């Protein structure tokens, strides 16, 4: 399906110069002279290269539809992650860097959605939010109202997030996987 260059949104998969790219960041610019354009930071889904491209409103690009399948995360071994197709029970091993920073939030038995292009895994989507345990939290400085009231804390998966002062070690919290931010205390 063809779309205008200014209709590209973050997360869209497009075909550009013979490659399959995911739009990562978008910035709409309207200079004083000339027509408006969309500055798009893209990541190649096959080889991981990044590219910044300027699309004018008159340009069109092909939007690619990916197939999605439900998988379950089984285990990690070194830099390899093993998933199981929930329909066929087939196992597939993927490199950890395909998931980027989100790989730290994988938990045994977690359900994920895998995006496939021509039967080849392109990306893995985790749930937007997961539960994690605080293993270390800095002390709160009383009376410090001039600055933000959040403090740094370390999760059980090694990721550091900013949490409210009432959160202490051993507390289970809900974390946004892609923003790596505190959402709320777990129930």
Swiss-Prot record:
Pfam families: EFP, EFP_N, Elong-fact-P_C. It is found in: Cytoplasm. GO terms for molecular function: translation elongation factor activity. Pathway: Protein biosynthesis; polypeptide chain elongation. Keywords: Cytoplasm, Elongation factor, Protein biosynthesis. PROSITE patterns: EFP. Gene3D superfamilies: 2.30.30.30, Nucleic acid-binding proteins (2.40.50.140). SUPFAM superfamilies: Nucleic acid-binding proteins, Translation proteins SH3-like domain. GO terms for cellular component: cytoplasm. The keyword Protein biosynthesis applies. GO terms for biological process: peptide biosynthetic process. HAMAP family: EF_P. Involved in peptide bond synthesis. Stimulates efficient translation and peptide-bond synthesis on native or reconstituted 70S ribosomes in vitro. Probably functions indirectly by altering the affinity of the ribosome for aminoacyl-tRNA, thus increasing their reactivity as acceptors for peptidyl transferase. Belongs to the elongation factor P family. NCBIfam families: efp (TIGR00038), PRK00529.1 (NF001810). This is Elongation factor P. It comes from Rhizorhabdus wittichii (strain DSM 6014 / CCUG 31198 / JCM 15750 / NBRC 105917 / EY 4224 / RW1).
